[in-house]
Amino acid sequence: MVLIRVLANLVILQLSYAQKSSELVIGGDECNINEHRFLVALYDSTTRNFLCGGVLIHPEWVITAKHCNKKSMVLYLGKHKQSVKFDDEQERFPKEKHFIRCNKPRTRWGEDIMLIRLNKPVNNSEHIAPLSLPSNPPIVGSVCRVMGWGSINKYIDVLPDEPRCANINLYNYTVCRGVFPRIPKKSKILCAGDLQGRLDSCHCDSGGPLICSEEFHGIVYRGPNPCAQPDKPALYTNIFDHLHWILSIMAGNATCYP
């Protein structure tokens, strides 16, 4: 009888440990405080609810996902813990918002991108600096890093106080076509994740970066529901495929794709 109780307690402890570990790795582990100086936190300025992540690419410009757009938004730069404010944290508001096809209500596959011009440039500091745009297309098979304040529980939204980081793999586009059969044969989408279902971006990570070879290659777009399922990677908007549009907008030479 005693042996049965001991074995039962060991099983309970193992199940408890497995559950806690699973919850922790959906959004990864806490990011190093110095590795995400470009990471932006987007909030609804009316409700003050957290919306999405974003990426600083220039002192005056931020990239995020189009589906993160709200009429009233505020952006925080230089933030780590949501509950603690750094001395160099800066608050900004959108001065301009640019979309791929601004006269089209529907977003095409791979075009879930929004370029925000800030109302005032930010200053580089200990916790704030832009991330480099890609110089070449990403390489399938690369290990990339995803980060954000998204949910750490795949079934209900449990947002962490600090951003989580995870290393995931970049897969061939055909892998994601098997998971999302509605996506076209060709699109401006990257396919990345962990086929064992241990690591994944999740709810509220939208708009955050996928970083490969220390360059900004993808925006968190969408994934399986619930997150972090085996053999089901997530979709990321491909930054390199939109590079000409991004640079043209920043230079004042373009507005929308036709």
Curated annotation (Swiss-Prot):
- Occurrences of domain Peptidase S1 (ranges): 25-251
- Tell where it localizes: Secreted
Give coiled-coil spans as residue ranges. none
In which organism is this protein found? Answer: Calloselasma rhodostoma (Malayan pit viper)
**Which InterPro entries does the protein's record reference?**
Peptidase_S1_PA (IPR009003), Peptidase_S1_PA_chymotrypsin (IPR043504), Peptidase_S1A (IPR001314), Trypsin_dom (IPR001254)
Key word Flavoprotein present in the record? no
Q: Which residues are glycosylated?
A: N123, N172, N253
- Entry-linked Pfam families: Trypsin
What functional role does this protein have? Thrombin-like snake venom serine protease. Cleaves fibrinogen (FGA) to split of fibrinopeptides AM, AO, and AY; the aberrant fibrinogen is then incapable of being cross-linked, forming easily dispersible clots.
Point out the propeptide residues: 19-24
Q: Report the protein name in the record.
A: Thrombin-like enzyme ancrod-2
- CDD domains tied to this protein: Tryp_SPc (cd00190)
Tissue note: Expressed by the venom gland.
Q: So what family is this one in?
A: Belongs to the peptidase S1 family. Snake venom subfamily.
Q: Which GO terms describe its molecular function?
A: serine-type endopeptidase activity; toxin activity
Active-site residues, as the UniProt record annotates them: H67 (charge relay system), D112 (charge relay system), S206 (charge relay system)
- The reply on keyword Cytoplasm is no
Cystine residue pairs: C31-C165, C52-C68, C102-C256, C144-C212, C176-C191, C202-C227
Q: What top-tier enzyme class does this entry carry?
A: hydrolase
